[in-house]
Amino acid sequence: MAAEEGQVIGCHTNDVWTVQLDKAKESNKLIVIDFTASWCPPCRMIAPIFNDLAKKFMSSAIFFKVDVDELQSVAKEFGVEAMPTFVFIKAGEVVDKLVGANKEDLQAKIVKHTGVTTA
């Protein structure tokens, strides 16, 4: 279930999540996780922007989408309490978190942690 370059990797089972996260960690790229829910209007609003950012930063980051209702244990592991929540992982460690559907803040954090200002 690997995504093509520049695509968001949707994880719908714990097994897929574990395999894909391990692969992403091996890449040494920034990992950006969008914790979302199908019933969340701000999540639906930010989804196309998140997809665009995945294309823009494909050489320096890997993007995941996790539905909190499908993978409750993963959401709990990362302390997700509101949606959308974006978690940023670098070198296997959580380095940042953003709660809310703010396009500018999301892009700014990706730039900050990748060091890439333009794609």
Curated annotation (Swiss-Prot):
Disulfide bonds: C40-C43
Subcellular compartments: Cytoplasm
List of catalytic residues: C40 (nucleophile), C43 (nucleophile)
Matches recorded under SUPFAM superfamilies: Thioredoxin-like
InterPro entries linked: Thioredoxin, Thioredoxin-like_sf, Thioredoxin_CS, Thioredoxin_domain, Thioredoxin_H-type-like
Keyword Chaperone on entry: no
Alphabetized Pfam families for the sequence: Thioredoxin
One Gene Ontology term, aspect cellular component: cytosol
Keywords: Cytoplasm, Disulfide bond, Electron transport, Redox-active center, Transport
Main subcellular location: cytoplasm
GO molecular function terms attached to this record: oxidoreductase activity, acting on a sulfur group of donors, disulfide as acceptor; protein-disulfide reductase activity
Domain Thioredoxin positions: 2-115
Highest taxon, organism lineage: Eukaryota
Subunit details: Interacts with MDH1.
Similarity comment: family membership: Belongs to the thioredoxin family. Plant H-type subfamily.
Function: Thiol-disulfide oxidoreductase probably involved in the redox regulation of a number of cytosolic enzymes. Possesses insulin disulfide bonds reducing activity.
Protein's UniProt name: Thioredoxin H4
The encoding gene: TRX4
